Amino acid sequence: DIKKGDKVITYHIEKDEQGRYHESHITSTIECVIRTKCENNKETMVQLGNLLITPYHPIIDMVNYEKEWSFPIKRGTSREHKCNYMYTFVTSNRQSLVIERYIFATFGHGLKENIVSHDYFGTESIINDLKKFPTYEEGYVNLTKNMIHRDENGLVSKIE
């Protein structure tokens, strides 16, 4: 199990003005593990190898040497899977995790590229909301779906 303080491999990619990609893999530290309870112990997910992921959680496919963010739903079929919890992470440097040969966007990532950009998940706003939970400093936050609030467009905008 991944926990606060664990060292993980993170990934960063930037595209310069000439369209060239600059990539780096570095070691980062897990700041917090976010565990969201699946309703009725099931969730709609896409299976990519051994990775089960929600259909719209941005990834980069390292298996096929891709450089652009995409949604898992473009790579596989979404279906209901039995699962008790979904896990998301906050890294100390806010960089993306490497999981099962996929790059996995973390909360507060600050990325502005197409697909991965998000006004809440990609900013410190989500980190600030998570820090309000008394267990954040211990390295974990347990959520239920009713703690996740959406705006008028259906996008997640607050957790409390």
What residue ranges belong to the model's regions?
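HINT/intein-family self-processing domains that catalyze protein splicing or autoproteolytic maturation
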Residues: D1-E160
